[in-house]
């Protein structure tokens, strides 16, 4: 029997279906996502929750003429399935396949790329104003999760809507979750709207009465009646005060009602906000039971939802376990996260120290300034934020923390290549954007045990500290029961050598070990150095080896521009030393999504490439090369 989904290659095909057929199509799409993502992983829960909403939008509006701007856009899988990418859906988040986020390069239906939260409303407003200025008629719809409303950028845009356009539709997709349960006053406010029994009762009664009225204007009357009752109960609805007409909340899984609502809203000449209630993980019991886990995950059993376990602890888990130890040692230690307790593993810290744990929502700037404020009163804030998200707080890092020399510890999870999530999530710029800032100490551990030592050392340091560590599991080394202090600004010489000095940053020490072995097999004695701290840098160790070897190799999981290798070149220049330098790192481009090993091979972040480049110089020291020369 042919599936309805088999007939959908574009939104035009979707419009050929009867409204009554869309429920069956929704079921087929859910099953397709459950099956495909069980093999490759992805953001399953959020996408299961927006099936009906996405179908209704495409049924009423006309993309690519009209524009759907998804906040974060990790919930755009259904959109991709019905906009010509169905036959490539099995490649999602795989190298060479379609992205797990909206991508302007991928499809004309993706009007705006994203990956971080809070951008949709600003972008949609910009599109709407551009449309107005050229006299266009297309619709612009911003799809924002409720978590996006904990992000200050969203409210900056809301503050600007009424004064700049009269035609904009904002959809608030309310499932009470981002990656973790939403927090703060905004989340409580949404819940108050949804659960107000008087409002729900009156709304339902009015609808039942009006359903019996004849005439074409009944829908308009119904809407006005609903708004009248709402205004009685909610005289100061925040969105109304900001100039958007509020509609809802409505059931985000009722396709017929969604379609009728969109048909009504598309004809209105005022900015509107539609509050839609959806269920994250709908249609897959394991995803409903464990919404946090199924927000985004790797391969899983499509029947039970079980995922394979790793025998090794992740760096995030070691971070959380160490934080618990530090909190036991020092009552002034506090932990701060920006809506990522699960991703940073601070959900393990929270039950033990609930009064010393703070989830501030998707608000990285606020998180950093909040930490700075606590630091002025003697507390030791550890601010755990993904490397890619800390970019959003660059000004507070400089202005509020480093300028005042406050002892805030930035714990940069996902430092380095992130993998399947792609360019919006790789943490490849942090060394470059942090090492230019005065007063900050930057550390990068080679393994799990050294991470624990660095966290402990940071507790005793009187100024700002950034500790960068990667996603996923480490090498499996044992972590000491009690961490130890490490000397800030002093490198660890793992192995001495006469011909080559390999400076490997962080987890790239493992690659450095392999390179040293390969060079030894080729007859060259190689030293291996673990820098430990990028800032302050151990210039003395660099000078010692620069005066005694024929080649320096730097290896980093970071862009070359402004990164660790650049630092080595700068230091050699300052020392007045000339020596060939081979730099291994990421090129000056945004790195696509894919498995880490595949991407490293493609871009030459391999032992083989490092060996080849090194031997070119060692065998022909006087020849011209394209390698970096200090």
UniProtKB/Swiss-Prot annotation:
Superkingdom as given in the UniProt entry: Bacteria
EC id: 2.2.1.7
Annotated binding of thiamine diphosphate, by residue: 74, 115-117, 147-148, 175, 284, 364
Pfam families: DXP_synthase_N, Transket_pyr, Transketolase_C
HAMAP family from the UniProt entry: DXP_synth (MF_00315)
Cofactors that this protein relies on: Mg(2+); thiamine diphosphate
InterPro entries, A to Z: Dxylulose-5-P_synthase, THDP-binding, Transketo_C/PFOR_II, Transketolase-like_Pyr-bd, Transketolase_BS, Transketolase_C, Transketolase_CS
Name of this protein: 1-deoxy-D-xylulose-5-phosphate synthase
Cofactor note: Binds 1 Mg(2+) ion per subunit.
Record's subunit section: Homodimer.
Keyword Cell inner membrane: no
PANTHER family: 1-D-DEOXYXYLULOSE 5-PHOSPHATE SYNTHASE-RELATED, 1-DEOXY-D-XYLULOSE-5-PHOSPHATE SYNTHASE, CHLOROPLASTIC
Assigned protein family: Belongs to the transketolase family. DXPS subfamily.
Catalytic activities: D-glyceraldehyde 3-phosphate + pyruvate + H(+) = 1-deoxy-D-xylulose 5-phosphate + CO2
Keyword Secreted: no
A single GO cellular-component term on record: cytosol
Keyword list, A-Z: Isoprene biosynthesis, Magnesium, Metal-binding, Thiamine biosynthesis, Thiamine pyrophosphate, Transferase
